[in-house]
Amino acid sequence: MSAGEEAIVASGNDNEGDQTNGNHTGKTDEYDPSTGSALSNFLWHGGSVWDAWFSCASNQVAQVLLTLPYSFSQLGMLSGIVLQIFYGLLGSWTAYLISVLYVEYRARKEKEGKNFKNHVIQWFEVLDGLLGTYWKAVGLAFNCTFLLFGSVIQLIACASNIYYINDHLDKRTWTYIFGACCATTVFIPSFHNYRIWSFLGLGMTTYTAWYLAIASIIHGQTEGVKHTGPTKLVLYFTGATNILYTFGGHAASAVYWAFGDALLNHSNAFSLLPKNGWRDAAVILMLIHQFITFGFACTPLYFVWEKVIGMHDTKSIFLRALARLPVVIPIWFLAIIFPFFGPINSAVGALLVSFTVYIIPALAHMLTYRSASARQNAAEKPPFFMPSWTAMYVLNAFVVIWVLIVGFGFGGWASVTNFVRQVDTFGLFAKCYQCKSPVPAGVAHAPVSALHHRL
């Protein structure tokens, strides 16, 4: 989940009547620490800087962690490691820029006498207050689209993962089942506190990442393993754009080391690891995490939709649930149409993450401080490792140009090409994407290694 997505998710903490409106009063109930036990305060009460880091860290990997080894097989080990570090640094920089813009917006508004007590500042408010309504609309459009497809990916990932515990049902059937389960999020009024979910999410993804790394090392390299590396530009840039999305190099490199080119046809890392209790535990934890992430991603979309149709003041939970169905049903439908776990991640990374995480924050920072007076009165000066404002502008310009050309341009071309190829190969509404081919009766007792997987 990107920093921009974190901003829209923050709207879940606002009062229901004012959700997603960049100019709302956004009041929330003041939490009284004396009303609960020390344990409940520790687990439930949020809102601190640490909670922001917990939330970002717990949502940063999610299901994309399982496709990073697939990306490494497209890139090769060296390029994979280099790009992980490179995009990790760029992502950290743009996250810093977003925090600077938040501070700047708050400082300017406080000078005007605005009180931010019990108010959750949203990313769209920041863009609106610093750069105008056009920027607010752009930010809202990109983030809502990102959340929409992020929710689709969670459903696809749920079906893909559970299949490796129970393959008696095909992935499309599992998508029906998990779509129905995730549709129950329409009954959730809002998320007032995130800390417990952040703890859980961080624990689940940490376990899965280390399971992938340790299980791959213990398994060792498969017989005749090959690490061909990049063979086609389409594959190379497809893998590179998936790394735009997240960070998890220790798991990805270990799985690629063990299985090599076999990952080119197995976008979900679980598919190659031996079935045992450790893997089943990782699958179950990821399923829970994906359900939580689906709720985090969908809830702000519900608020936007309620605002559009004028249902945001409705007190009835059932009426609001009915009003939210036009949001969740298309998400469910899209997950059934395009079940391409892996390729869809790269497409979302290239076409949406490029802007929400990298381009928009860097451009917004450049335009906010374009005048000498803005730089002179800035609430946050350049960091100690930046010698001047000019250096910051150069770095921001590099981020914009690099991501626009390499991430959105080449990455978008490669990801869309690969996505279309999956549609041509498997068709829409694919019953079981990358599942085992049926075993003919004559070879029913052949060794497991003789079974092959579809592309």
Map each language-model feature to its residues:
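The first (N-terminal) embedded transmembrane alpha-helix
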Residues: 49-66, 179, 242-249, 405-407
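Hydrophobic alpha-helical transmembrane segments
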Residues: 71, 184-189, 333-339
